[in-house]
Amino acid sequence: MNQERLIAAEDITFRYQKDADRPALDHVSFHVSKGEWLAIVGHNGSGKSTLARALNGLILPDEGSIKVGGIKLTEETVWDVRKKVGMVFQNPDNQFVGTTVRDDVAFGLENSGVPREDMVERVDWAVQQVNMQEFLDQEPHHLSGGQKQRVAIAGVLAARPDIMILDEATSMLDPMGREEVLDTVRRLKDQGMVTVISITHDLNEAAKADRIIVMNSGRKFAEGTPQEVFRLNQDLIKIGLDLPFSFQLTQMLKESGLALKGDHLTQEGLVNELWTLKSKM
């Protein structure tokens, strides 16, 4: 993985109210490397969504600093930073502003004054990346939740940011829609098109990331690969997080004496190893 740092957050603190007893972000430091998928997880009120807003300049930290693509985030640089960061939010219906898929993907480009010929090329390219090219002239009420979120991702891609932040972007989708969106994100990330930060309370979603930061009470509680973080097990449960079912089942099978080698984050991985063990019996 290319280790160029796209985001460097150093000791950031933020309070929504200056006299608040506890800050929403309490001396948080981390970095994000180019080409990485970082998941930031936590229960409601943990600080994860506040962190997402800080990374896009929707709020500015009271203390500490954030650099995005080498640019220090300030009131003067916030629009330069936002050109580098695109966001996909929770509710797909609240994000759809065009009358058709084509209009929606083009909306941000029109506001940025992109020439029409360039805009048409970008829209066509972006919808192809999310496999929505057959729906260009469809109205939003004809689309599923997963399809609307893929259109939102296309709108972000068309603007050509370095980083895409998914702020609970799958939480209102059914399982099929959720997998559609996450598979799309993984493919775009693997093809080197964008660096991904996903904000979520769902550890099944976080398991797909390269690295996880766990937030609790405004502080960084843990950080590591999915396997490293999930091994905290009961510590995560105590702060209101549910471990992925496949990981829990793997641990139960190991405790019962089954000689499993992996800490499986997906059901597919667990099933494959079980079949391998069965074939050796």
From Swiss-Prot:
Report the SUPFAM superfamilies cross-referenced here: P-loop containing nucleoside triphosphate hydrolases
Q: Name one Pfam family in it.
A: ABC_tran
Q: Which cysteines are joined by disulfide bonds?
A: none
The annotated topology with respect to the bilayer is: Peripheral membrane protein
**EC category:** translocase
Looking at the record, the residues that make up the ABC transporter domain are 7-242
Subcellular localization is given as: Cell membrane
Binding residue positions for ATP? G42, H43, N44, G45, S46, G47, K48, S49
The question of whether tRNA-binding is a record keyword is answered with: no
Q: Name one GO molecular function term.
A: ATPase-coupled transmembrane transporter activity
Q: Which SMART domains match?
A: AAA (SM00382)
Q: Which UniProt keywords apply?
A: ATP-binding, Cell membrane, Membrane, Nucleotide-binding, Translocase, Transport
Q: What is its EC number?
A: 7.-.-.-
Query: What Gene Ontology cellular component terms go with this record?
Result: ATP-binding cassette (ABC) transporter complex
Q: Which InterPro entries match?
A: AAA+_ATPase (IPR003593), ABC_transporter-like_ATP-bd (IPR003439), ABC_transporter-like_CS (IPR017871), ABC_transpr_CbiO/EcfA_su (IPR015856), ECF_ABC_transporter_ATP-bd (IPR050095), EcfA_1 (IPR030947), P-loop_NTPase (IPR027417)
Q: Which CDD domains match?
A: ABC_cobalt_CbiO_domain1 (cd03225)
Q: How does it assemble?
A: Forms a stable energy-coupling factor (ECF) transporter complex composed of 2 membrane-embedded substrate-binding proteins (S component), 2 ATP-binding proteins (A component) and 2 transmembrane proteins (T component).
Q: Which NCBIfam families match?
A: ECF_ATPase_1, PRK13635.1, PRK13648.1
This molecule's function is given as: ATP-binding (A) component of a common energy-coupling factor (ECF) ABC-transporter complex. Unlike classic ABC transporters this ECF transporter provides the energy necessary to transport a number of different substrates.
Q: Which family does it belong to?
A: Belongs to the ABC transporter superfamily. Energy-coupling factor EcfA family.
Q: What is the name attached to this protein's record?
A: Energy-coupling factor transporter ATP-binding protein EcfA1
Q: Which gene encodes it?
A: ecfA1
